[in-house]
């Protein structure tokens, strides 16, 4: 995925991973961090100011509210352990531009995927890539899944 000069939305940013890391690595990329917890937003804004990250916008709102007014705004949307995969897709896919990507990082993705194929068709997305890896120092399995939003049929 070409990240440079794109717009990225990180859902449920928490402490800022991956949103803040992407903002540091790609200063020409606009990053929107969505976080409903005010204390976490305070932290994200503090880091933004200390590191002078002019490409970051921190929004203290719920994903559902943000999604109502920002349809097909971002080239890439990321989410980690914010909600079950089905809900992440439901909230995140409307934010993604056509041909853009939704990237989910989950720990027990196999348990969540048993009934999701019909849902992928309904949302007009296809799985493009999947990377399974162990977190360093934890020996804990994670899966990154990249979905691409398709044109309406």
Enumerate the predicted regions with their spans:
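Helix-to-beta-strand junctions that scaffold the AdoMet/dcAdoMet cofactor pocket
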Residues: 26, 96-98
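Conserved beta-strand signature within the Rossmann-like core of class I S-adenosyl-L-methionine
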Residues: 99-109
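Conserved SAM/SAH cofactor-binding pocket of Class I
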Residues: 1-80, 89-90
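Short glycine-/small-residue-rich Rossmann-like dinucleotide-binding loops
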Residues: 81-82, 107
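Short gly/pro/ser/thr-enriched loop/turn and capping motifs at secondary-structure boundaries
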Residues: 40, 96, 109-112
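Conserved beta-strand segments of alpha/beta enzyme cores
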Residues: 30, 55-57, 101, 126-129
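Active-site capping/gating segments
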Residues: 32, 108-153
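Short glycine-rich, flexible loops that bind phosphorylated cofactors or substrates
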Residues: 85-87
């Amino acid at each position: 995925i070409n990240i440079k000069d794109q717009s990225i939305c990180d859902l449920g940013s928490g402490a800022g991973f991956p949103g803040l890391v992407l903002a540091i690595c790609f200063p020409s990329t606009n990053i929107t961090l969505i976080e409903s917890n005010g204390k976490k937003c305070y932290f994200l804004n503090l880091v933004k100011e200390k590191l002078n990250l002019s490409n970051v916008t921190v929004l203290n709102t719920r994903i559902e509210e943000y999604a109502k007014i920002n349809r097909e705004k971002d080239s890439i949307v990321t989410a980690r352990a914010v909600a079950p995969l089905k809900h992440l897709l439901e909230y995140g896919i409307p934010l993604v531009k056509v041909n853009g990507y939704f990237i989910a990082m989950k720990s027990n993705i196999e348990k969540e995927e048993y009934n999701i194929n019909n849902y992928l068709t309904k949302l007009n997305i296809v799985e493009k890539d999947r990377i399974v890896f162990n977190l360093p120092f934890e020996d804990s399995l994670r899966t990154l899944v990249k979905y691409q939003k398709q044109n309406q049929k």
